[in-house]
UniProtKB/Swiss-Prot annotation:
Superkingdom of origin organism: Bacteria
Protein name: UPF0758 protein PBPRA0202
Keywords of this entry: Hydrolase, Metal-binding, Metalloprotease, Protease, Zinc
Molecular functions (GO terms): metal ion binding; metallopeptidase activity
GO biological process terms held by the UniProt record: proteolysis
Transferase keyword on record: no
Family indicated by similarity: Belongs to the UPF0758 family.
A Pfam cross-reference name: RadC
Residue ranges annotated as motif JAMM motif: 173-186
The keyword NADP is assigned to this record: no
Length: 224
């Protein structure tokens, strides 16, 4: 059935405008993104079908271009559109993070790092550079590796920190396996980085490991 034949209050776009985005199901939200259906399926039916094939919105968002474009109703234009939406969302979170003290909003910091790193297919090492008020100067992926490791060079972290005139750092990396527990290598490199930065009076405030739905804080565990 065409969405135009549905009562106005049941159409996803109109429902969002009158009741807000929270009132919509995943399929209805995805239908607004899709805008149109395909032969034999309206936008909501196509969205429901795609969610069943991918398993979740998260899996759809994390799909690479090749996998994404294999599905009917999706293609390079939709993939580019989705990546733009994801990037805008991440930049919004980063802007919000920069507006405050990361130590007074630890949950927001966790949420930002989770959104940024959780679904990466390769291990990446990310650094938040902070000023003397613990406000974010910048955040950067400094190293990217394979599915289970990333080579990290403390000298490069020190160099970049001095370039930003940072006073403190928050380190983070993901475990694509989904398990957020640190390895012995994680513990060693964190101590090496912390010691190297201490020589130039820069503190490591925390190191987060991002897994599948969980984040482990070195500071909270007493490892820093």
């Amino acid at each position: 059935m065409s969405l135009k034949l549905l009562p106005e209050e049941s159409r996803p776009r109109e429902k969002l405008l009158t009741r807000g985005a929270k009132a919509l199901s995943d399929a209805e939200l995805l239908a607004i993104f899709l805008r149109t259906g395909i032969k034999g399926m309206n936008a909501v039916e196509l969205a429901t079908h795609l969610l069943a094939e991918f398993g979740s919105l998260r899996a759809l968002f994390a799909a690479d271009q090749t996998l994404f474009c294999l599905h009917k109703g999706l293609g390079p234009a939709k993939y580019a559109q989705l990546q733009a939406i994801i990037e805008m969302s991440q930049r919004h979170l980063e802007e919000t993070l920069k507006e405050g003290d990361v130590l007074t909003s630890p949950q927001h910091t966790r949420h930002y790092l989770s959104q940024l790193l959780r679904d990466r297919q390769r291990e990446v090492f990310y650094v938040l550079f902070l000023d003397n008020q613990h406000r974010v100067i910048a955040g950067e992926v400094l190293f990217e590796g394979t599915i289970n490791s990333a080579a990290v060079y403390p000298r490069e972290i020190v160099k970049r920190s001095l370039e930003f005139n940072a006073v403190a750092l928050i380190l983070a990396h993901n475990h694509p396996s989904g398990v957020a527990e640190p390895s012995q290598s994680d513990l060693r490199i964190t101590r090496t980085i912390s010691d190297a930065l201490a020589l130039v009076d820069i503190r490591v405030l925390d190191h987060f490991i991002v897994g599948d739905g969980e984040i482990v804080s070195f500071s909270e565990q007493g490892w820093l």
